[in-house]
Amino acid sequence: MEKNEKIHADMQALGRAACAAARIVAKADTATKNHALAMMARAIRRDEALLLAANAKDVAQARNKGLESAMIDRLTLTSRGVVSMATGLEQIATLPDPIGAMTDLDYRPSGIQVGKMRVPLGVIGIIYEARPNVTADAAGLCLKAGNAAILRGGSEAIQSNQAIAICVREGLRSAGLPEQTMQVVETTDRAAVSALITMSEYVDVIVPRGGKGLIERITNEARVPVIKHLDGVCHVYVDLSADLEKAVRVADNAKTQRYGTCNTMETLLVHTGIAEQFLPRICQIFLEKEVELRGDEAACALVSRMKPAVEEDWYAEYLAPILSVRIVADIDEAITHIATYGSQHTDTIVTENYSRARQFLREVDSSSVMVNASTRFADGFEYGLGAEIGISTDKLHARGPVGLEGLTSQKFIVLGDGHIRE
């Protein structure tokens, strides 16, 4: 059997096993699912040293291959990160179980009662690159939402993902649930991705997390619905009526708290009427933190160490200590810039003007739109969703951070007492 044929056969076997497991986990009660989550968390805490050792091997190989610093940052697990994975699973256990919830029940003139019931999606294929924590987060969220999952992590994190998967399977066994509820693809061959995204007979939805190239490929080739975002070109607009202290805090945090995340600010927009006061101050902070600044002509005139920006900079998701800066005439120009160059991820306005705040919330067409808050808050945990499986900039099926509810669907339910249609 040729290599690709074997990979295809192996993926088909994973798909069949996932479908069988999905039927079982969909019926699992809340206590069983929560017990599995607790046991996963316990195993992760217990095996911290093993997880860190596996991750250290992945990081060493990544450095030897010359991978970018942003990729290595996302790949690296710390003791704090291991604890965070376990805590995330425990927090998912505390979240309300959405499965079986009935809403919108109403009697119709015919006498029947019509409503909706929340149900699992089924089998979720999750494709991700360098973040080992996604293995635990995705397993926990998919389980609590009553789904089975097939997890395909990046080759750079294969040893970390396999070590975490051992803990996940232990938790499932402890709760009497099939280990096949959460399966990790063992091969790093890209043919496995092609097989996974075309198995419409087994997989109900694909959630990709990674670089633009990966997500574009999956979107173009998939025969299964995809929940995704391509880029995180996030903006902070500092309005004429902004409180400068708030603006400094928000802009600094949005850019420098962590460079390699999709909710990091990549472009700073500043109203021309406040630019002379604000830009030199905030840019001095950025320069002290070794952030490279690229600005339009007006911004460069105010900050001598700023490089001229080119057209590509406005579209760029740097994931690095680089920031684009533009001075705009008013809020309308800021909104137009975001509509032209943004990625519909997360954008914020800093302003003390209520009407302009409302205008920004209404007119900016992004999955998260904020007022006087850092873009770094665009996160399932910060939104009270628990760990997120990703952020969607699509408008169907889920939008924004995708937590438990985003991993479910609804079906209509009809209650009668021998009713017939006349």
Swiss-Prot record:
Keywords: Amino-acid biosynthesis, Cytoplasm, NADP, Oxidoreductase, Proline biosynthesis. Pfam families: Aldedh. CDD domains: ALDH_F18-19_ProA-GPR. Pathway: Amino-acid biosynthesis; L-proline biosynthesis; L-glutamate 5-semialdehyde from L-glutamate: step 2/2. It is an enzyme of class 1 (oxidoreductase). Coiled coil: none annotated. One of its GO terms (molecular function) is glutamate-5-semialdehyde dehydrogenase activity. It catalyses: L-glutamate 5-semialdehyde + phosphate + NADP(+) = L-glutamyl 5-phosphate + NADPH + H(+). It is found in: Cytoplasm. Its EC number is 1.2.1.41. GO terms for cellular component: cytoplasm. Its main location: cytoplasm. One of its GO terms (biological process) is L-proline biosynthetic process. The keyword RNA-binding does not apply. NCBIfam families: PRK00197.1, proA. Belongs to the gamma-glutamyl phosphate reductase family. Catalyzes the NADPH-dependent reduction of L-glutamate 5-phosphate into L-glutamate 5-semialdehyde and phosphate. The product spontaneously undergoes cyclization to form 1-pyrroline-5-carboxylate. This is Gamma-glutamyl phosphate reductase. It comes from Nitrosomonas eutropha (strain DSM 101675 / C91 / Nm57).
